[in-house]
């Protein structure tokens, strides 16, 4: 399962003491390594510069938007990811060199940046109408996955005799090859049009079902043949009832647009009155500010 990490930060907090008697970071038979030596080495690396860039951005974002990002919001998103990955959550963090604490900080950084994008985005009615065409409400479905089309057709025929959800769950447990959902009657987590994990053909079929109905033809994807049952589908309704959701989806799409993020970050940093005191690092924000941030 691919993970789209929220913000390109390492999750490392670096604190350097530059006093004359610099603290020792490590000792070896060949001598000691001091914080100032470590700093001098790290600041020359791309990863070291990237960490400083992110630390500066986080400081500025916290001052401007910190009050808009509560611990509750951070924990809600954290728990969503934790639930998504289940028992593999800890190993996913480890594979990405992250701790639970640093991941929460990454989530917070992303939410702060999102607030900045909101603040610097004027959503037009034309954009809302365009997003409405793509919009689908959050639906909940169950599916039965099999390898042969004929098996899927046999299952559909059984459902035509008894199309209840109870019968569907029995059939899922008996026939489905999806081991992660079959014991729960094939039930999947709710999703809407912004979902990127499911096959587009599968989603189109699911969105087209009325609540309590099932697909009368097998739905083919790269995984095999699906029979889909709609557990919950509130219907699309009217655009005026979903303005808030549409705006949120537009902002989310801008969070994936590098040009938008470049523009927003540039505005935030310029407003933040950033001053780089180390002459060797004065150009690390030049791609955002257009010139070096010299010592003042």
From Swiss-Prot:
Covalent lipid sites (S-diacylglycerol cysteine): 21
Covalent lipidation (N-palmitoyl cysteine), chain numbering: 21
Domain (PpiC) ranges: 136-232
Reaction(s) catalysed by this chain's protein: [protein]-peptidylproline (omega=180) = [protein]-peptidylproline (omega=0)
Cited PROSITE patterns: PPIC_PPIASE_2 (PS50198), PROKAR_LIPOPROTEIN (PS51257)
Annotated compartments: Cell membrane
Main location: membrane
GO CC annotations, alphabetized: plasma membrane
Protein name (Swiss-Prot/TrEMBL): Foldase protein PrsA
The species this protein was found in: Ligilactobacillus salivarius (strain UCC118)
Chain's gene name: prsA
């Amino acid at each position: 399962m691919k993970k789209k990490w929220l913000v390109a930060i390492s999750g490392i907090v670096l604190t350097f003491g530059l006093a004359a008697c610099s603290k020792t970071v490590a000792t070896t038979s060949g001598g000691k390594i001091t914080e100032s030596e470590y700093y001098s080495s790290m600041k020359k690396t791309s990863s070291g510069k990237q960490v400083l860039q992110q630390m500066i951005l986080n400081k500025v974002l916290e001052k401007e938007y910190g009050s808009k990002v509560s611990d509750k919001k951070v924990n809600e998103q954290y728990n969503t990811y934790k639930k998504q990955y289940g028992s593999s959550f800890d190993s996913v963090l480890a594979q990405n060199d992250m701790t639970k604490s640093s991941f929460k900080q990454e989530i917070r950084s992303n939410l702060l940046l999102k607030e900045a994008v909101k603040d610097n985005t004027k959503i037009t009615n034309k954009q809302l109408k365009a997003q409405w065409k793509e919009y689908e409400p959050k639906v909940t479905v169950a599916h039965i996955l099999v390898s042969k089309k004929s098996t899927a057709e046999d299952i559909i025929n059984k459902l035509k005799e008894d199309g209840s959800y109870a019968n569907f769950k029995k059939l899922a447990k008996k026939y489905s090859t999806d081991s992660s959902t079959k014991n729960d009657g094939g039930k999947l987590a709710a999703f809407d049009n912004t979902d990127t994990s499911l096959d587009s053909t599968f989603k189109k079929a699911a969105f087209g079902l009325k609540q309590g109905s099932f697909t009368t033809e097998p739905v083919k994807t790269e995984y095999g043949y699906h029979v889909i049952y709609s557990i919950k589908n509130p219907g699309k309704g009217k655009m005026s009832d979903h303005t808030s959701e549409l705006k949120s989806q537009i902002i989310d799409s801008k969070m994936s647009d590098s040009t938008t993020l470049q523009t927003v970050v540039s505005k935030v940093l310029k407003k933040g009155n950033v001053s780089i005191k180390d002459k060797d690092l004065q150009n690390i924000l030049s791609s955002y500010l257009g010139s070096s941030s010299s010592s003042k």
